[in-house]
Amino acid sequence: MQVILLERISKLGQMGETVKVRDGFARNYLLPLGKALRANAANKTRFEAERATLEARNLERKSEAQTVADVLDGKSFIVVRSAGETGQLYGSVAARDVVDILGAEGFNIGRNQVHLNTPIKSIGLHKVELQLHAEVEIHVELNVARSAEEAERQSKGEELTSVDAIYGVDEDALRPEDFFDPEADGVDEDEA
């Protein structure tokens, strides 16, 4: 199906371009959300008549997204979740959790604007991509930890899944020669 794009759509085209897409993509996504029009003579003349207002509205949405992006870009947010000793989360941090975290900080972001390939399932520092507008893309950092203190240590670069971090054990004190002393048994090497 041929459609006229009413806004820039990544991996598809710019506003005003006529592109060929699959029928289902057009019927179920582009047309209902107002992102495209069917490419026929009537819609082409309608688009040309409304082009200036569409461009102005698109520019306004882009500037709003850019102001939010200037505040959000590169920010770090702490996410406290329960996790096992190895750093594996008992649950996960998904796109809706990211939306809730940003909403608690006063940012109104939609779930479809959060791009997570897979949910976050381990503690650590994770980069999350936010696409606020078709032309405005930023990254925020999620500091996933078991507690606020661990998040602070993690932000300083400390590894929290090592043996030392988990058990508070000094690995140098666990040398085998400290545990095995042949003279301690009372058996002399010359007699054996």
Curated annotation (Swiss-Prot):
Residue spans making up a coiled coil are none
Q: Per its record, what are the GO molecular function terms? A: rRNA binding; structural constituent of ribosome
Q: Which domain of life is it from?
A: Bacteria
Q: Which Gene3D superfamilies match?
A: Ribosomal protein L9, C-terminal domain, Ribosomal protein L9, N-terminal domain
Is Ribosomal protein one of the keywords UniProt gives this record?
yes
* Location of the region described as Disordered in the Swiss-Prot/TrEMBL record: 172-192
One of the protein's GO biological processes: translation
Keywords from the named record: Ribonucleoprotein, Ribosomal protein, RNA-binding, rRNA-binding
Q: Spans of biased composition, class Acidic residues?
A: 179-192
Give GO cellular component annotations, separated by semicolons. Answer: ribonucleoprotein complex; ribosome
> What family does the entry list?
Belongs to the bacterial ribosomal protein bL9 family.
Summarizing the function annotation, the protein's role is: Binds to the 23S rRNA.
NCBIfam families per the record? L9
Under the heading HAMAP family, the entry gives: Ribosomal_bL9 (MF_00503)
Q: What is this protein called?
A: Large ribosomal subunit protein bL9
Source taxonomy: Bacteria, Pseudomonadati, Pseudomonadota, Alphaproteobacteria, Hyphomicrobiales
Underlying gene = rplI
